């Protein structure tokens, strides 16, 4: 008699990961719950999340392991985030956390300690294998309002081969309904709306102030004229309008954060747009790196609408993205540009710079 396959369910203590664990158990897997202990304090990634995850595992009658990676989280995510803001960019910690921790350290723990090579998570995304290309693909979730493929673009082929996304074909409402039907203790738990770091600190401002010394500096326009004073350049990001504290006859937006000179550059909305951008650390997902430029739909922020663009591959895992129809607003260095063909993620990379030429 063949035994049922084993799978690790990554459990944060939230409704999504809990339902994902219940679904793979229902599909016949022998499930082992694993929760990553990321930081001290209360919240979804701290003690509250671990307690809720433990209760769910008890309800599902599956074993539960807690893996203490607080030091690795500090080094891999916190330091990365702080250094990025010091440099005047807007880092994307969630994609890094997915690659390095959830499908990095967690998968390594599953293989080494549990002898399990597959991980199910509560991400809203889809994946599979294309026999024609010989590649594992990544695609948007059915629920476009909750789709998280943007944050998963950097997963390697090996990581995608080990990933299971049980919620990819479901809507958030269906997930909530199923959690209630199963009687899960987290069925009505409120959804976390912030980064786990922000949740623990109370706000992004609090988090940054705890890690970066505040230095006042100048707010200038694109010609260098001084318009006002800021309370720390790390509190500003490209495209920001609120909180500038500068009077002008037209709305002002952050055009650039000049960390080297401790300046925040502002201008009219059109001055915060770009016709192209360059990206680095490119990861090609559902297709191999092409030899020639390709057409694709590009998303330059998590909530931005995809726009038609030309992707020109560059050496050293780089690419240039030229927007075909119109300049794009608020292209922030440090964020990801992810390109799609329909629902499938073709690739993505970290935005390095943008231009209007």
Curated annotation (Swiss-Prot):
Gene Ontology CC terms, in alphabetical order: cytoplasm
Binding site for ATP: 10-17, 36, 122
Annotated EC: 2.8.1.13
Protein location: Cytoplasm
Chain segments carrying region Interaction with tRNA: 146-148, 301-302
Record protein name field: tRNA-specific 2-thiouridylase MnmA
Keyword tags: ATP-binding, Cytoplasm, Disulfide bond, Nucleotide-binding, RNA-binding, Transferase, tRNA processing, tRNA-binding
Catalytic residues of the enzyme: 97, 196
Protein family according to the UniProt entry: Belongs to the MnmA/TRMU family.
Coiled coil stretches, renumbered: none
Keyword tRNA-binding: yes
Catalytic activities: S-sulfanyl-L-cysteinyl-[protein] + uridine(34) in tRNA + AH2 + ATP = 2-thiouridine(34) in tRNA + L-cysteinyl-[protein] + A + AMP + diphosphate + H(+)
Cysteines engaged in disulfide bonds, as pairs: 97-196
PANTHER family from the UniProt entry: MITOCHONDRIAL TRNA-SPECIFIC 2-THIOURIDYLASE 1, TRNA 5-METHYLAMINOMETHYL-2-THIOURIDYLATE -METHYLTRANSFERASE
Record InterPro entries: MnmA-like, MnmA-like_C, MnmA-like_central, MnmA-like_central_sf, Rossmann-like_a/b/a_fold
